[in-house]
């Protein structure tokens, strides 16, 4: 027995004593210890594991169905409960959490998971339904944020006014993989495979993307669509033993990242570029995310929150792709002359490079 100040330490034939969080190792060459003689103290802070967080909700069949298919695949075990009562499941470095409310209403799930488990969340992937006026069946991928709203305005579908989430680098590579999988499972041409512009919440602090099934209840419940989304995650994260798809590394491969500006919600002209191999995707600002008020006669100032949107989108995209080459791609035909002039001048002022389609090859 060793007395160290007011602390009694027991030794059972071991040559070291460990304390965790942080771990303190006391090493000696004998089991009968003389206080602090011939001993070394070493502080070791345990490594925190990096994990992918997948979020599903029982509130939505287009969310829980793919999650259920995914959980039926090998390797899953029950994980800890996230307060107040959110179930979790674990498979290698992947965590799937399942709650019971709207997918856009549970904020800060990444930081809440870190606080509860001590793990570090590397990215967040939400499973959700998609709605559209056209009611067309679709499988969609998109970043999140509510960049164009003014401070004090209340976003209708989660997030925070003026906020741009970090974009998940997997968006581009997974869109291309999703298209191949959907074709292989005969979902195309019935289902459109597409990007969506940046929109809605919830709040996160880690690189995030949404995978959605649309666009009506009939399609939200489609098991073949749920199966393809589950396979996308399974293969995309390498859970089956293959190489993960879409891990960002500025040291290898192409580094060009598309920042989409303008166009409709489904970003068709940006899509044409993103479907090329090795193109990465940052924020996608549809026309509604770029409110512009034409200057009054005799004035030059163009009002609206479009500058805020572009700047926030650029900064978030840049932070999501360290070492990347961010190129703004404008949907030229979606702007009036005065709008295009104002945007290109602002991009130049902000030192944001503009890329034409051929610049992404």
Model regions and ranges:
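Acidic, Ser/Thr-rich peripheral helices and adjacent loops at domain boundaries
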Residues: 274-292
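N-terminal catalytic or cofactor-binding beta/alpha core of small enzyme domains
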Residues: 11-20, 24, 29-205, 216-217, ...
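N-terminal low-complexity segments that are often proline-rich with Ser/Thr-Pro
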Residues: 7-9
């Amino acid at each position: 027995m060793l007395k160290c100040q007011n602390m009694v330490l027991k030794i059972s034939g071991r040559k070291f004593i460990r304390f965790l969080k942080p771990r303190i190792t006391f090493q000696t060459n004998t089991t009968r210890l003389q206080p602090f003689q011939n001993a070394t103290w070493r502080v070791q802070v345990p490594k925190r594991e990096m994990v992918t967080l997948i979020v599903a909700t029982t509130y939505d069949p287009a969310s829980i169905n793919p999650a259920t298919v995914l959980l039926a695949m090998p390797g899953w075990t029950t994980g800890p409960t996230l307060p107040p009562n959110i179930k979790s499941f674990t498979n290698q470095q992947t965590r799937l959490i399942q709650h019971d409310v709207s997918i856009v209403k549970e904020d800060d799930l990444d930081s809440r998971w870190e606080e509860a488990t001590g793990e570090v969340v590397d990215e967040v992937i939400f499973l959700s339904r998609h709605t559209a006026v056209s009611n067309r069946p679709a499988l969609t991928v998109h970043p999140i944020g509510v960049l164009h709203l003014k401070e004090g305005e209340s976003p209708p579908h989660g997030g925070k006014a003026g906020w741009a989430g970090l974009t998940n680098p997997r968006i581009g590579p997974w869109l291309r993989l999703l298209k191949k999988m959907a074709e292989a499972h005969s979902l195309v041409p019935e289902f459109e495979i597409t990007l969506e512009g940046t929109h809605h919440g919830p709040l996160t602090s880690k690189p995030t993307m949404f995978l959605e099934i649309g666009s009506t209840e009939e399609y939200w419940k489609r098991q073949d669509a749920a199966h393809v989304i589950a396979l996308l995650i399974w293969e995309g994260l390498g859970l089956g033993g293959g190489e993960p798809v879409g891990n960002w590394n500025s040291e290898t491969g192409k580094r060009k990242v598309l920042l989409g500006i303008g166009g409709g919600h489904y970003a068709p002209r940006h899509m044409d570029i993103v479907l090329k191999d090795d193109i990465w995707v940052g924020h996608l600002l549809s026309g509604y995310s770029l409110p512009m008020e034409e200057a009054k006669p005799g004035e030059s100032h163009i009002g609206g929150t479009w500058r805020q949107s572009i700047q926030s989108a650029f900064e978030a995209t840049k932070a999501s792709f360290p070492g990347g080459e961010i190129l703004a791609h404008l949907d030229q035909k979606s702007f009036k002359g005065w709008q295009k002039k104002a945007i290109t001048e602002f991009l130049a002022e902000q030192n944001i490079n503009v890329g034409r389609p051929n610049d992404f090859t």
